[in-house]
Amino acid sequence: MKTFTKSALFLLWLIPMSFFAQSSVSGTVTDAGNGQPIPGVNIIIKGTTNGTSSDFDGNYVLNGVNNGDIIEFSYVGFIAQEFTYSGTSRIDVALQEDAAELEQVVVIGYGSVRKKDLTGSVTTVTADDFNQGVNASPDQLIKGRTAGVTVIDNGGAPGEGSTIRIRGGSSLNASNNPLIIVDGVPLDPGPGGTRNNLNSINPNDIESFTVLKDASATAIYGFRASNGVIIITTKKGLNTDGKLKFNYNGNVTFSEIVDKIEALDGNQFREYVTANGSQAQIDLLGTENTDWQDEILQNAVSTNHNISLSSGWDWINYRVSLGLLSEEGLIKTDQLDRTSLSTNIRTKFFDNHLRINTNIKTAIEDYTYATTNIGAALGFDPTQPVFQDNNFGNYFQWLDGSGNAIALAGQNPVAALEQNDSRGLIFRSLGNLEVDYKFHFLPELRANLNVGYEIASAKTENITSANSVANAARTGNDSFSRSDQKRENLLFDFYLNYRKDVESLNTVFDVTAGYSYQKFLDSGNNFSRGFDLVEIDNPFNNPREVLLGFFGRATISIADKYIFTGSFRRDATSRFSGLENQWTSSPSGAFSWNAHNENFLKDSNLISQLKFRVSYGVTPQQSIGDATPSLPRILTSDPQSQYQIGQEPDGTPIFISTGLALPYNPDLTWETTTQYNIGLDYGLFDGRVSGSIDVYRKETEDLLFLAALPSGSLSNEDDVNLGNLTNEGLELSLNVTPIQTENLRWQIGGNITFQKGEVTELFAVDNPNFEGFFNTGFVGSNINIQTVGFAPNSYWVFEQIYDANGVPVEGAYVDRNNDNIINEKDKYIYRKPAADFFYGFNTILDYKNWNFSMFWRGSVGNYNYNFVDAGSNGRRILNFQNTLSNTTTDLLQSNFFDGGVDRFSSDYYIQDASFLKLDNISLGYTFKNFLNYKNIDMKLYGTVNNVLIITDYTGIDPEISSGFDSTIYPRPRTYQFGVNLDF
């Protein structure tokens, strides 16, 4: 008993002794390179949650330390260090900068460059910064994330693409799309049927986007890069010593309708027709109150499953991924099912002198297209039922007294969906084989060969039911049409790179020279079967264009402070005729100064980066719609338009094709953009605050434009070089990490872009009274104009007159030239589609295993032409005596009955489309070592997209890339719930 008592007393004595044995340790954390203190360093006892962080002066105090504890010091951009506590009360730590971080490379044209050696305006968005909740379209990943770049959805259909603009584009009528390169292969626009040529890339396979904005960065790609370049790099396998890495990412998405067009309901419609219509029209009214938009719209469900396997050793690694997407549309019957497969294999031989990289990406998109739209639902009589006994599938249709369909009458939108089967099967594959060899006898010299391909085929079919009103004139058979298209894109790139570090001069020389060849081919067949099973077959096979280029680039880096870059490219195209017009040059030059490496800033504890950049470059453009606009051509007729010249002895008719001489312009030449850029990259407090400032000016000459031809010409229009255009802007970006501890990290980021475009010269005509060129026509009128001194696509409109109550007076416009006549001479330039400035900002909060993010986006100064409301008038309802059509509730405000064609050109319909959107909110939780299995992590997440929009615009969505709102496919609000599993 005495022994037990003594033992118990001894144990009780040990408990407080062990408590008092815990100690505190303090010290200072500095940068080993310059001796400056580092604030915000994470200091933690490994295996515990006991930790602290260094203060602004690098000082720290860590309590509760026991002998043998391992203390870890870590900070972004530095190599972590560990110390075993042995009783000392002070530990001072000098962290070394992470060489891998210092040597971080950025993918640019034909190679890569150390981030610190960049001289151009280049932005990289990595997977950590992607927008959340994206299923089908990769371009959505970077929407609003980069200054100077706009990404506007073309609509909300499954797999819908976007209109991407870098610094506002450079052209009026030629392409303004950036060049998109995936793992070294420039993409070609897809064939008909596909909604987005990026859909062959699974968003889950993307590692990063690199955006090249100024001409010094893009000129190496020549004329294809006049509107900027987006380089997509996909994920690769890593060296895991043969261990297999598995990832599964799956989610389910629920989509709902955010808004609808405000159409007259059944009661409002009956009231209007009763008050204003004839007795025959009143007799047409039904008794229903049908919301036709509700009849064709639905809430949708989508699923997305992605699996990837990767592994590797020092000499070989690989990654294989499979994606399965099933996405319903908001319009009934609209559906996309996509299967994607991606494979990457990287090998190294001969002591890393030979590297071979193989990429293959394949996707099959199976579309079921909705065969009606919101506009059709808007215009159908809301007093009629969906169904009615008749010979047209028992859907209500406008019929005459004999039960026949009335010509030109609107079709029941539900019947248009159900009685049409429209499908598309898109196959797309792209890949490349890249061989990189570093010469043994001269290791500074590398040869790189890149052979790539892109093949896209589309088969689209449409079957219209025999009892559809669309087949009313046919003989009881279904109508059928099919289109087969194929596009091929073949690439051959070769370059030599020589990089020499001359230590005696503290200078690095980097020189690249190479050759590029790309060929495009279109082929296909159009087939239709309709009246009495007559079959029409129309094959085609057209070489589209061939592109040749020789390029070179030289970079000199002196003491990591002064970097000079120059590039030159010589290109040829088959679009233009004559050697003088077929060839063009793309020179560029740039200089950057890493001021933070100067002695007067090297020891600064405030400034961690300060880089000044200046650049100049020229990039041409040739992507006008016609593939051969400079060559004389004859258009031969299709089989339906052949001319019979006689017959064979057996009576078989003999046909020959007719021909039409097409207009051409042998003097057509390159559109050329010269760009100037001044930039600043900065970082403060060891990168806790960072950002960039860029000022740019783009001057485009010899604008390519499809312009109207004089009367008597063989065609109404032809391609010409007609004038000059300028675009200038200011881009600002800022990223701040206000809090960074072991358990809590808060990041704030944002960007804003101010932009201004102006047509500076039009020289296609010699007429001082010439108003300008038009490129958006409707109902015999025009709304967008290109004219000197104003922004591209400015609105050309009448000035509406209003009464004392602010109600527009029908057909009344200001006589601006005071000649007592209202005609086109009274129109004026009013507003523009492009924003004065646009912005995006986000916040990310990580607390232990929780992750929260929120992203906002907006624009100011952009105006839309609301063509939906412009068509709202009483005559639209009462135009015929045997049918009725609906319109929007704007009729109740304007009370317009007709107003003539001039109504469409009223500034009443030019509306402020500025907006602020809460694009997405995401919340996730990660289970580390899930179910106590080591190296298995599971993340559960939820994301809401298209959360909130604040705008004065009266349409269903203010984001219209062209500014011309003629109803779009509604963009849904989505709720996504998913799981990500790694082991």
Task: Cite the ranges covered by each PLM segment.
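Short, small/polar-rich motifs associated with maturation and membrane association
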Residues: 1-343, 348-349, 354-357, 361-363, ...
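Short aromatic-centered micro-motifs
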Residues: 31, 43, 73, 180, ...
